[in-house]
Amino acid sequence: MSPSPKIDHDDVLRARAKLLATTGPTRREEVEAYRVLAQVNPATHLPRLVNALLSLSYDHGLRDSHPLRLALCEEAVAAARAIDPGTPDREKLLFRALLMCHRELYALGRRAEGLAVLADMVAIERSWGELSGVPAVSALHLWATALAEEGRHAEAADALAEWVAAIRPLRPDFDTLARSLAEWAATLADAGRTDEALSAFEVLVDLDAGEATADRGPLACHFYALVRYAELLDGCGHAERAAAARQSALAALTELATTGERKVQSGDQAPFWAILLSWSAADGERLASDGPCPPSGAGPRQWSAEARQRYFDRLATLREQVNTLAEDPDRHLPELLRLHRMLTVRSAVQCEHRTYAFAAQLPELQPLFDEGVELARRLDAHDPAAGSRTLAEVLIDRSTFRTAACRFDAALGDFREALGLRGEDH
């Protein structure tokens, strides 16, 4: 940002008068004033111009004007880059301006440009880490999520590996670390790196077990993790290890049904359940999508607005498709079950996402899980060879839902029936 070749001193006086007015300048007046003053004294006024531009971009009147907000953010980025490199907080101002620019680019659907901005942010934080010796990785997590939405799973997995390695020495809270490990494992699996995914998820299972044993974390979360771990092992052909994981899950659920949680827990069990449930259905979701997909293992609050909207907008279409096939269910049972599970999983994720009062959403979700079990029983009656495995899977889905709803006895009944269908009820 180069100074104007000619400075109008009347403009400078008016700019200073605006800033010193007793009523105070509006945000727009502040921007106009600092645009002028930054030409006179860039060292002092360029940082103030950056802050003023970003403040104006927050203005309520511009809430739905993403092109205008983007223009302000881009001007803020240019102003921040023009600040002398030796100025304190220059990089922090630039990082903040880039973050706002990234958000507006994504809001306008300009995802490739948004990714490029994120790459700049990651580079800035890496330079901070090299100078301070303390990793700065907030942009790295955003970068990984964005890469995963574009299907660039190998790059996303590498970014998440760096993220997890950076935050673990900082001793993050249990929920943050558990979700980070789940997201990393899911992204590794999406990248086809199944052995690494299993190793990452084993760390999560061990972490959950330790937290539950020490009464620091919910036993329900350990149950969900064991269920998902067994599914991963099955997918990799490790049938005996998968069966052993389900026996451990049975022991955890039996304790919950007998004594309940060992201590009163926070409301963070349902989000973890919803994350693992959506991950288990992610393969089918990707096959049905032709745009940005939600990253496996990440909650909807981490997704981009576009990915979130696409995911939830399909609920109405799924319901119509399910209702159409349900008019003659016996002709379409396998496809009906597949679509019904997609509908159930998306509905569960939506209910958990839109409110922290998850218990209030249970009446809406219960019929979906019950319908899924009834459809699977019909398939089992028509085709026991294929139906028993499907019924076991749907019963386990409902068991995890009932656990999230703190209906532990009913959850245990479902889980035991599922193990019986799999021949694992010994």
Annotate each PLM feature.
Residues 228, 232, 259-260, 329-363, ...:
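Long alpha-helical repeat scaffolds
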